[in-house]
């Protein structure tokens, strides 16, 4: 496999058609009728002008709209000298078909006891202890760490379930099904095709082992992340539409260090094109769950949660069988959510990288002796200091354009569309140390952050192969001709998705930027402070449990 125009895999021809469904949409508000009495609306182009001979018209316009996407086409020339014309015009046509939004689940930004996750920790601890007698040998932060660790188990189950469900989808009008989708999820398609029964067994064993622990179903935090990891979404309600989906970049592994309390550390998931097999996913799951199974406090907290919420109030994971499939859905608000996403880059895992920025590593921590035991997650985002990577953040230091379909937007529509948005408020480097990367501090984020995007298209050089592109919200077009062409080609592919993330283009030595590249509909300008308040409301809601002193 090759990445960024080097990762490839052989395509598979599909033979079964999938059905797409609409589960909801947005109604456009009535047009304003308050016009003057002399106003006249523009009229339509009347087809009757051309249809005096309807039978001949029908024969002349009979065209086959059946070209599958996921295939290479040469549109050819209609000039006298095709040889001469080919020097200037590339008539090859490839339509990209898959865009994957790679995300990391988070508890929201938290740097003291007043953050939403710490208020939620107090609420759930109060409720669980109210429903249980006796002395607890764990603190409220430990209980919240337990609940966050359970989220990663549920995401992993949804992730591998989607792999299995996608492997059974075929359609003659979209050659990206199912192979390209599996490649985007980091799995070896041939391994899934050849070992269906083993994959079904593994997915069910993940559900069974995760079901050994209790987590409250009232926390929609779990539902949100399971939904992200399960679904497929199309950019138009047609059979040849392009596909969007979500994939976890990393999950959180539970660790109990004793003296400093429990914490969650990163466990990286496969990237697009990694070609991981079933055995690799088995190792990942064992790594994720091993520290939970051997921890006494984890078992005690599970029992207390079970007693507090009851068997009917717990998260349940469904089994899979040979008929399990995931069908694509068209939903304008989900597309608006992807369109408003802003990528923060890969997690910073090396502690040495963060010298001069204490406490900003990608870990969810708590220490009873520090900050009154508050759960802390206040990471820095950044790259290795190269210009083209640093520029990916510059556009996100400004206020963002919130662009929505339709008109008359409700609070529910706005809050859903902003779930993947992140803004940055300051650029920082360690004093006097130019060798360190440029780091950016967030101005608030929600229950997940987008790390980057993966797009898959047909490779022009070898049309039976696929090309994997990884990109962010900024595209740099430098002076070098080869990079200039490659980045413009990438931009051309991205904007073929109707609701691709908004992009900014930076070019030349002066590093001037312009954008966004987007088809603006009904839009407004959103500030970092307003976005931070939205995220705070959402995190508070998604960790909801019965509360003693608040009347909703």
From Swiss-Prot:
Residues 9-28 have a biased composition (Basic residues). The keyword rRNA-binding does not apply. The keyword Acetylation applies. The 7 kDa polypeptide is acetylated. The record marks 65-66 as: Cleavage. GO terms for cellular component: T=3 icosahedral viral capsid. Pfam families: PBV_CP. InterPro entries: CP_picobirnavirus (IPR048835), CP_picobirnavirus_sf (IPR049178). Residues 1-41 are annotated as: Disordered. Keywords: Acetylation, Capsid protein, T=3 icosahedral capsid protein, Virion. Homodimer. The capsid protein self-assembles to form an icosahedral capsid with a T=2 symmetry made of 120 subunits. Picobirnavirus particles are capable of disrupting biological membranes in vitro. This is Capsid protein precursor. It comes from Human picobirnavirus (strain Human/Thailand/Hy005102/-) (PBV).
């Amino acid at each position: 496999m090759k990445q960024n125009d080097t990762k490839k895999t052989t395509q598979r021809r599909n033979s079964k058609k999938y059905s797409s469904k609409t589960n909801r949409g947005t109604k456009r508000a009535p047009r304003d009728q308050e016009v003057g009495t002399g106003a006249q609306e523009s009229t339509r182009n009347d087809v009757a002008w051309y249809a005096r001979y309807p039978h001949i018209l029908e024969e002349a316009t009979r065209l086959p709209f059946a070209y599958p996407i996921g295939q290479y086409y040469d549109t050819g020339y209609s000039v006298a000298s095709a040889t001469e014309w080919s020097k200037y015009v590339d008539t090859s046509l490839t339509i990209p078909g898959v865009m994957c939004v790679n995300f990391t689940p988070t508890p929201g930004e938290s740097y003291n006891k007043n953050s939403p996750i710490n208020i939620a920790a107090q609420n759930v601890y109060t409720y669980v202890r109210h429903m249980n007698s006796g002395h607890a040998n764990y603190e409220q932060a430990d209980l919240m760490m337990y609940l966050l660790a359970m989220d990663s188990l549920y995401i992993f189950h949804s992730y591998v379930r989607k792999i299995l469900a996608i492997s059974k989808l075929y359609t003659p009008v979209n050659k990206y099904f199912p192979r390209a989708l599996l490649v985007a999820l980091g799995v070896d398609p041939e391994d899934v095709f050849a070992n269906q029964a083993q994959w079904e067994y593994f997915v069910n064993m993940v559900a069974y082992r995760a079901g050994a622990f209790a987590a409250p179903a009232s926390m929609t935090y779990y539902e949100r992340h399971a939904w992200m990891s399960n679904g497929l979404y199309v950019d138009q309600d047609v059979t040849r539409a392009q596909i969007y989906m979500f994939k976890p970049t990393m999950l959180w592994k539970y660790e109990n260090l004793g003296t400093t309390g429990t914490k969650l550390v990163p466990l990286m998931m496969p990237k697009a094109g990694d070609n991981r097999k079933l055995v690799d996913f088995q190792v990942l799951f064992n790594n994720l769950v091993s520290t939970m199974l051997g921890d006494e406090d984890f078992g005690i907290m599970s029992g207390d949660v079970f007693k507090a919420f009851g068997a009917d109030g717990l998260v349940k994971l469904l089994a899979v069988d040979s008929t399990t499939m995931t069908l694509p859905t068209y939903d304008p608000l989900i597309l608006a959510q992807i369109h408003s996403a802003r990528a923060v880059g890969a997690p910073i895992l090396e502690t040495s990288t963060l010298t001069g920025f204490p406490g900003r590593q990608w870990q969810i921590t708590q220490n009873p002796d520090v900050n009154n035991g508050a759960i802390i997650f206040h990471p820095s985002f950044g790259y290795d200091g190269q210009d083209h990577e640093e520029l990916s953040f510059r556009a996100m230091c400004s206020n963002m354009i919130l662009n929505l379909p339709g008109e008359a937007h409700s609070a529910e529509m706005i809050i859903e569309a902003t779930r993947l948005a992140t803004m940055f408020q300051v650029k920082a480097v360690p004093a006097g140390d130019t060798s360190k990367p440029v780091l950016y501090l967030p101005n608030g984020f929600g229950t997940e952050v987008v790390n980057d995007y993966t797009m898959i298209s047909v490779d022009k050089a070898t049309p039976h192969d696929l090309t994997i592109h990884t990109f962010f919200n900024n595209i740099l077009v430098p002076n070098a001709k080869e990079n200039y062409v490659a980045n413009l080609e990438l931009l051309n592919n991205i904007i073929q998705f109707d609701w691709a993330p908004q992009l900014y283009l930076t070019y030349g030595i002066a590093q001037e930027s312009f954008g966004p590249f987007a088809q603006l509909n009904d839009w407004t300008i959103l500030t970092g402070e307003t976005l931070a308040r939205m995220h705070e409301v959402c995190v508070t809601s998604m960790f909801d449990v019965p509360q003693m002193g608040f009347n909703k």
